[in-house]
């Protein structure tokens, strides 16, 4: 998706915790830690790098243990595998801070979990149809009470510089993943800790719960099931055999099956290593038995197995077709028993008809039913914007990923619509009952590598869709951003609210861009921003009725140093009269490590 490293879009820019500093390797010599960093890592971790890797100042905010974990089992194993254990530890201690701060004993919950208000849950990324709409009864917030929101508690994530996990609220608890792979079960009202679990790699998705279990994936392509009450592992499996497969979209759970989207970081390595044989990864959706983790079916978004297509200029084999990652949570059409997924670009030639598309699979068998492509011949990877373009496909196109989830809604009278949006700034209304026939299309945003629509919109029960605009422009922090409201039936623009002038001007990583996902309740839409603000908009007019700046230090309930930063891939979660948001997105944005919980008057 051409996203920050693994995210789904502009890999290099938007993925905090997704950056993959895979620099060219040189023969191992007896080098000091500083020399090791300069020869192995500085190529990617420098100002203006093409992959959005964090700069040394950001790395120094991480614990050395977190850096070591990234080198040994996480997102930097590509470079870590070329180092000896002693070298990995030396680089980690050279870059990182002292030991991660432990969670205070006083932050442990003293009582067993209590059930939340009936129906006051937000389970996973969104409902089956990906509307990201919370009805009034479950929201517990209104147009009148939203302006009264105040911070109730803050929770700090230890040793990390990104907090990109979107919280799930279920039975009075918060389930959220962290960049270091820790999954937390917290009390929704107080933030105290019930349990933690250490996954193999970072967890950037929203966990989904069902049948007493919590399900999630990590940035090494692993999928997990834990006992929701205790955090004990029930099963763990690989969603894909490719070593560069990652899970960046939340799974969907229905009728005993877990549907998992699979994306990959092939395109990032292609940018940093011309000797890499680009590219062999294929996106997919995998159906697993939720009870056992056994694979039921696997549906690839590239139907043909990649084959050798030649050599690049340094003699490395080239492969294709490839790519077409599924970056986001799939949409379940429970009426038609169909699963819809948005796809990204081809990483190498030849291009396919399933890239930059909505693809539809049969929920029972995984059979491809149809594909509706919006941008054809879009072969692209990060080498196309890097210093060394060896692995850039011939005649690359525009990187117009459809990296967010389609929104399925009824229009009445037996008619339905599936709304899709992409990085080119286009929004489409499709007929899901006529193989994705285009009902309408609108050019809303300027688009670009980090432009257009990145992480997804929302739709309420009034026939309106709300989408946040990115249009990030490097070096121009006041450019980009905005929230737009469209009529579902026609695509007519009802209103647009431009992004306010950023208050973070002068801070590295500041931008007015608003690539974050939207959440909507009756009368109010919530949207975060690259500038670190979380805002509430009146849905009738687009007027901003509440605004909170997260770029500040917080007193955390678990005693850790906590600070907010950019809000990019993380979505607001509303349930039981509270609003939850994580803040911090390192790389080219502003780092942070905090989960914030708001309630009316802070009560």
Specify the residue positions occupied by each region the protein language model found.
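Sequence/structural segment immediately N-terminal to covalent heme-attachment motifs in c-type
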Residues: 31-47
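Blade/loop signatures of beta-propeller domains
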Residues: 108-152, 301, 306
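Repeat-blade elements of multi-bladed beta-propeller folds
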Residues: 119-127, 160-184, 200-223, 246-277, ...
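Bacterial N-terminal signal peptides
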Residues: 10-27
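Surface-exposed loop and turn segments in beta-propeller and other repeat-based domains
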Residues: 155-157, 238-241, 296-320, 368-397, ...
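Electrostatic cytochrome c docking/interface patches
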Residues: 25-36, 110
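Extracytoplasmic electron-transfer domains, predominantly the class I c-type cytochrome c fold
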Residues: 43, 51-99, 338, 578
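Beta-propeller blade signature
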Residues: 227, 281-293, 354-367, 480-491, ...
């Amino acid at each position: 998706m051409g996203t920050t490293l693994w995210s789904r879009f502009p890999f290099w820019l938007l993925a905090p915790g997704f950056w993959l500093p895979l620099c060219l390797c040189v023969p191992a010599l007896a080098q000091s830690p500083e020399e090791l960093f300069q020869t192995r890592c500085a190529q990617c971790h420098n100002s203006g790098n093409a992959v959005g890797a964090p700069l040394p100042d950001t790395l120094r905010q991480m614990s050395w243990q977190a850096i070591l974990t990234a080198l040994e089992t996480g997102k930097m194993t590509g470079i870590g595998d070329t180092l000896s254990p002693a070298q990995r530890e030396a680089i980690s201690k050279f870059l990182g801070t002292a030991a991660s701060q432990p969670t205070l004993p006083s932050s442990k919950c003293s009582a067993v979990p209590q059930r939340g208000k009936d129906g006051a849950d937000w389970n996973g990324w969104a409902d089956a149809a990906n509307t990201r709409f919370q009805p009034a009864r479950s929201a517990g917030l209104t147009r009148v009470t939203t302006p009264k929101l105040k911070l109730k508690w803050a929770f700090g994530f230890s040793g990390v510089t990104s907090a990109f996990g979107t919280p799930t609220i279920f039975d009075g608890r918060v389930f959220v993943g962290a960049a270091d792979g820790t999954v937390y079960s917290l009390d929704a009202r107080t933030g105290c800790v019930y349990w933690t679990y250490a996954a193999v790699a970072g967890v950037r998705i929203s966990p989904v719960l069902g049948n007493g279990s919590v399900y999630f994936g990590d940035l090494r392509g692993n999928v997990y099931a834990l006992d929701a009450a205790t955090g004990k592992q029930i099963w763990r499996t690989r969603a894909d055999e490719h070593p560069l497969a990652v899970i960046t979209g939340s799974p969907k759970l229905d009728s005993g099956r877990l549907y998992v989207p699979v994306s990959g970081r092939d395109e990032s390595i292609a940018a940093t290593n011309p000797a890499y044989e680009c590219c062999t990864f294929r996106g997919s959706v995998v159906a697993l038995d939720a009870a056992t983790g056994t694979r039921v079916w696997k549906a690839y978004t590239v139907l043909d197995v990649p084959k050798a297509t030649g050599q690049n200029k340094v003699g490395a084999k080239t492969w294709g077709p490839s790519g077409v990652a599924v970056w986001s949570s799939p949409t379940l059409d429970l009426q038609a028993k169909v699963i819809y997924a948005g796809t990204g670009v081809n990483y190498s030639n030849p291009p396919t008809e399933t890239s930059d598309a909505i693809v539809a699979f049969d929920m029972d068998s995984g059979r491809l039913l149809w594909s509706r492509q919006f941008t054809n011949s879009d072969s692209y990877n990060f080498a196309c914007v890097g210093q060394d373009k060896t692995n850039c496909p011939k005649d690359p196109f525009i990187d117009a990923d459809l990296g967010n989830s389609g929104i399925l809604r009824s229009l009445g009278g037996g008619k339905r619509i599936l709304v899709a949006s992409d990085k080119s700034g286009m929004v489409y209304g499709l007929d899901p009952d006529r193989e994705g026939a285009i009902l309408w299309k609108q050019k809303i945003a300027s688009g670009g590598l980090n432009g257009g629509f990145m992480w997804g919109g929302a739709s309420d029960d009034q026939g309106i869709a709300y989408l946040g605009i990115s249009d990030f422009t490097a070096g121009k922090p006041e450019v980009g951003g905005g929230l737009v409201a469209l009529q579902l039936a026609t695509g007519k623009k009802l209103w647009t609210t431009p992004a306010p002038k950023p208050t973070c001007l002068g801070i590295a990583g500041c931008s007015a861009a608003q690539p974050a996902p939207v959440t909507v309740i009756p009368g109010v839409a919530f949207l975060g921003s690259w500038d670190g603000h979380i805002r509430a908009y009146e849905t009738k007019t687009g007027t901003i009725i509440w605004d909170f700046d997260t770029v500040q230090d917080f007193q955390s309930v678990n005693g850790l140093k906590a600070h907010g930063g950019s809000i990019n891939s993380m979505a607001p979660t509303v349930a039981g009269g509270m609003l939850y948001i994580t803040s911090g997105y390192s790389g080219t944005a502003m780092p942070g490590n905090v989960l914030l919980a708001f309630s009316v008057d802070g009560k």
